[in-house]
């Protein structure tokens, strides 16, 4: 369409300049986005055009300073060509996009041609009176105005999509060599069929239930099952042997004996005695937290209900009531008598009297070494003072209860059920005399 065919309104739209104070707003039809604008072109795009919003152009353009903040100014960088003027396989020449940054562009010129490995050179744009072609962008109302000044005097460079595709193909071509190198390295590190890996390179996971005994010369990494191990150490830290008159460390036995066999052995050795699962309140941390829970345990025990049979400590492989911590010594002196010992020193507790006076003298009394440096803190429980069977201090022998005789009608299990024993009363068991 010739300019003479336009009316006055259309001529006003075509005669605008990007630097005008007021741009035309009575635009009836916007232009399609142009990828290669050239030769002093003018375009009016919709403000909703994504490409216009991003100020895209297939020419290699970079932002330049402009005194007018409302106008975005971009100048052309030219094109990078091969110094040997080589041709690609498709029969076309190599036209690369110049880098936007000045330092990157200088570095790019020192690289080699991707096709013939020849030198690269930059052809600058001088299409606007000896200066680069300049593009102007301006957002005004519902439209985006574009104006190009100058005519490009160099070939079109490759588009951004073509440049990305070329880089991807280059990575694909170099990938097989890198994969072969990685496979070669993996075969070198792979052990031979006759070789065995050392213990130092194999991490081990050890728990108490597995019963694993590590060699003394082992120096590898050990990943311990700390929650379960700590809880088991609370129950099996110490044991007292009345028959042998010494101290037996259960942790040494559990390292060589299967836990199930150890459990059955302890259960067999305590079959002739009274099990503490029905007599003693729980001593593990977290089972009873206050005085009210202890009273509830005493009431349940009075009704013949085992409260611990339903609530098992999650870190124990067996319920707490199933560990046979007995009161009386074994009839066979060759079998070790295991007894639950406190984790705190008896001297630090003022309200810890002996269970009954020892009329037979120091028959089974002996000093037991207790590790006071244990990191597990045992909760302190206070026995209810209204308990009619609460024992008093050892300094008042006239207030202590005597041991019931064999002819007494009270059953020993029923009698001990009413006792509110806690960690404090567990210390009395060290000086326990024979009950029968």
UniProtKB/Swiss-Prot annotation:
Pfam families: GCM. Zn(2+) 2 binds at residues 82, 86, 113, 116. Residues 171-202 are annotated as: Disordered. Zn(2+) 1 binds at residues 76, 125, 152, 154. Polyubiquitinated in the presence of UBE2D2 and FBXW2 (in vitro). It is found in: Nucleus. Keywords: Developmental protein, DNA-binding, Metal-binding, Nucleus, Transcription, Transcription regulation, Ubl conjugation, Zinc. It comes from the Eukaryota. The keyword Transport does not apply. Highly expressed in the placenta. Expressed in trophoblast cells of the villi. Residues 174-202 have a biased composition (Polar residues). The keyword DNA damage does not apply. This is Chorion-specific transcription factor GCMa. It comes from Homo sapiens. The gene is GCM1.
């Amino acid at each position: 369409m010739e300019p003479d065919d336009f009316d006055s309104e259309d001529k006003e739209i075509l005669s605008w300049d990007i630097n005008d104070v007021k741009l035309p707003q009575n635009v009836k039809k916007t232009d399609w986005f142009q990828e290669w604008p050239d030769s002093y072109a003018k375009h009016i795009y919709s403000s909703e055009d994504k490409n216009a919003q991003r100020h895209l152009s297939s020419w290699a353009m970079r932002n330049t300073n402009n005194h007018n903040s409302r106008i975005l100014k971009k100048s052309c960088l030219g094109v990078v060509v091969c110094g040997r003027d080589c041709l690609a396989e498709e029969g076309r020449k190599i036209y690369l996009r110049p880098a936007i940054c000045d330092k990157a562009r200088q570095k790019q010129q020192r690289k080699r041609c991707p096709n013939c490995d020849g030198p690269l050179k930059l052809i600058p744009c001088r299409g606007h009176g000896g200066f680069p072609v300049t593009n102007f962008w301006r957002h005004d109302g519902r439209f985006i105005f574009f104006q190009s000044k100058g005519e490009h005097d160099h070939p079109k460079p490759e588009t951004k999509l073509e440049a990305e595709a070329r880089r991807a193909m280059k990575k694909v071509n170099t990938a097989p060599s890198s994969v072969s190198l990685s496979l070669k390295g993996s075969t070198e590190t792979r052990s031979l069929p006759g070789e065995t890996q050392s213990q130092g390179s194999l991490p081990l996971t050890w728990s108490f239930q597995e019963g694993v005994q590590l060699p003394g010369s082992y120096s590898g990494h050990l990943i311990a099952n700390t929650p379960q191990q700590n809880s088991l150490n609370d129950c099996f830290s110490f044991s007292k042997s009345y028959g042998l008159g010494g101290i037996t460390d259960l942790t040494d036995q559990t390292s060589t004996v299967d836990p199930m066999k150890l459990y059955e052995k302890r259960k067999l050795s305590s079959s002739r005695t009274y099990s503490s699962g029905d007599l003693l309140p729980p001593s593990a941390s977290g089972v009873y937290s206050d005085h009210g829970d202890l009273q509830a345990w005493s009431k349940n025990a009075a009704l013949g209900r085992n409260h611990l049979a339903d609530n098992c400590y999650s870190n124990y492989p067996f319920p707490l009531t199933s560990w046979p911590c007995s009161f009386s010594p074994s009839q066979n002196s060759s079998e070790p008598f295991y007894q639950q010992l406190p984790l705190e020193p008896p001297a630090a507790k003022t309200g810890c009297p002996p269970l009954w006076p020892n009329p037979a003298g120091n028959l089974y009394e002996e000093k037991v070494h207790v590790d006071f440096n244990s990191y597990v803190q045992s909760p302190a429980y206070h026995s209810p003072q209204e308990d009619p069977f609460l024992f008093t201090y050892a300094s008042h022998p006239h207030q202590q209860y005597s041991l019931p005789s064999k002819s007494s009608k009270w059953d020993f299990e029923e009698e001990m059920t009413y006792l509110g024993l806690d960690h404090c009363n567990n210390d009395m068991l060290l000086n326990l005399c024979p009950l029968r």
